[in-house]
Amino acid sequence: MPFPFGKSHKSPADIVKNLKESMAVLEKQDISDKKAEKATEEVSKNLVAMKEILYGTNEKEPQTEAVAQLAQELYNSGLLSTLVADLQLIDFEGKKDVAQIFNNILRRQIGTRTPTVEYICTQQNILFMLLKGYESPEIALNCGIMLRECIRHEPLAKIILWSEQFYDFFRYVEMSTFDIASDAFATFKDLLTRHKLLSAEFLEQHYDRFFSEYEKLLHSENYVTKRQSLKLLGELLLDRHNFTIMTKYISKPENLKLMMNLLRDKSRNIQFEAFHVFKVFVANPNKTQPILDILLKNQAKLIEFLSKFQNDRTEDEQFNDEKTYLVKQIRDLKRPAQQEA
């Protein structure tokens, strides 16, 4: 009978046991260089063996039974959590292997069940360790890859959204390292847009806190953060699932004032993204009195400003149609008393 675990002749249980032991050696502060080197080699070797079980090799497809055994061993031993907790102790290639192993095991399905998702729901610390990974440059991008894979699964996205740690994203997207800040923003955006109903529920329940933090991003000194945040705000407000949130946001005069200021930003791209949020205020047929007052007070200035606004975008038909529509809407604005007369 052929051995089911390929040429390494190591069972999933052996691989997990060896890897756990090698990780325990690396965790010790006072080990000799020789021992550390040996443990690092063992970790690399066992991670590769684990990948072969999950992904197969050129000669051999993955074996369902071996994959199931490996998954079970990872849960029972707590190794999945250890690999995330000790990611910075693993070498460069090994970190990439961990992310591939983690994401593969996370996607694993048995019928309609996703056992690793169920497991992480009971071991939520794994999610928060991944999130905290953004604070360590050497593991930030690996953690981002695993975190976004987690967010594909609604139960895991919900745990993060409803956690106190979610608000750490407002720090991470402002980080000075461009790659890390961009990666954090991609994860942040995923959380707010992937599961529409879940995101709408979250934004409705946490509106005040979320938008008071979000406004700081719109004032960011960092051009990329400011532009991405403005673009995402436009997407969130125009998504039909977020109708309640949009209605609330566009009823507040301070939000309109901010967009009018951003329309005059020194960056053309920021102006353009601000336009897409500003248009929602103007197009709203049920404007609140404070919004109407601001638009009427600035009516002539706005008409003149919009008539000349980015006129060189001649190819962008939709933008020009929207601009024409807004100018007409602002020109037709009247005070309610005048309308009744």
Swiss-Prot record:
Top-rank taxon, per record: Eukaryota
One term of GO molecular function: kinase binding
Compartments it resides in: Cytoplasm
UniProt-listed Pfam families: Mo25
Effect in UniProt of substituting residue 240 to A: Abolishes activation of STK11/LKB1
Biological processes annotated in GO: cellular hypotonic response; intracellular signal transduction; negative regulation of potassium ion transmembrane transport; positive regulation of protein serine/threonine kinase activity; response to activity; response to thyroid hormone; signal transduction
GO cellular component: cytoplasm; cytosol; extracellular exosome; extracellular region; ficolin-1-rich granule lumen; secretory granule lumen; serine/threonine protein kinase complex; Z disc
Keywords carried by this UniProt record: Cytoplasm
Membership in a protein family: Belongs to the Mo25 family.
Subunit structure: Component of a trimeric complex composed of STK11/LKB1, STRAD (STRADA or STRADB) and CAB39/MO25 (CAB39/MO25alpha or CAB39L/MO25beta): the complex tethers STK11/LKB1 in the cytoplasm and stimulates its catalytic activity.
Protein name: Calcium-binding protein 39
UniProt source species: Homo sapiens (Human)
Classification lineage: Eukaryota, Metazoa, Chordata, Craniata, Vertebrata
Gene: CAB39
